[in-house]
């Protein structure tokens, strides 16, 4: 490799440390990052495949602005998977609170929803099924997103009973492409930018 001085291979070098004065500076640095992140497909259709994303491709669907500030996200996905990374970046770039609920029990999840006033949950239908049966409503939750698996009207109805103030949608995505489109119930809309990719 042309840029590598062979005499410096395996030699310890100090890292250049960048100090940030504010979290806004950290977010700005992230948005300008040229770093790559390697993740693997689920293996649903065969052997898991390695997929390399840039920070830019992972954050392209992040929505920022005043209306996204002050949200409290339940972090219900594995942080090394596409959906986990997308939830992380959505929360991080808006300086939102992330509450880890991954692999917790139903009782622990409900306790954290109440304790932190969780406003947004993005998880698989299996995660939401694990919240059943329920004993009370949780009105702090404003938005529910399902992804990763097929769902049904019975589950939507149950979620609405648990989180009566929440809007519910279903996201369709892939590890290779990230979030593609979202549905409310059984009807989904394909964004204009990618409609020509579907028949």
What are these regions (language model features)?
Residues 197-199:
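Conserved beta-loop-beta connector loops within the AMP-binding
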Residues 59-72, 80-120:
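Conserved AMP-binding/adenylation subdomain of ANL enzymes
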Residues 1-26:
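Carrier-protein-dependent adenylate-forming modules in NRPS/ANL systems
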Residues 76-81, 126:
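Conserved AMP-binding
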Residues 36-63:
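Conserved AMP-binding A3 loop
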């Amino acid at each position: 490799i042309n840029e590598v001085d062979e005499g410096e291979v395996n030699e310890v070098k100090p890292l250049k440390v960048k100090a940030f004065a504010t979290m806004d500076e950290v977010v700005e640095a992230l948005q300008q990052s040229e770093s790559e992140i390697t993740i693997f497909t689920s293996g649903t259709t065969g052997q898991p495949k390695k997929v390399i994303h840039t920070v830019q491709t992972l954050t392209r669907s992040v929505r920022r602005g005043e209306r996204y500030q002050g949200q409290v996200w339940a972090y219900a996905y594995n942080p090394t998977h596409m959906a986990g990374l997308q939830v992380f970046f959505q929360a991080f770039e808006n300086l939102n609170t992330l509450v880890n609920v991954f692999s917790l029990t139903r009782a622990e999840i409900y306790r954290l929803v109440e304790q932190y006033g969780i406003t947004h949950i993005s998880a698989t239908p299996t995660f939401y099924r694990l919240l059943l049966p329920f004993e009370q409503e949780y009105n702090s939750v404003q938005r529910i997103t399902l992804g990763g698996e097929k769902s049904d009207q019975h589950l939507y109805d149950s979620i609405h009973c648990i989180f009566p103030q929440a809007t519910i949608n279903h996201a369709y995505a892939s590890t290779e492409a990230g979030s593609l489109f979202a549905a409310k119930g059984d009807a989904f809309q394909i964004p204009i930018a990618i409609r020509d990719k579907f028949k």
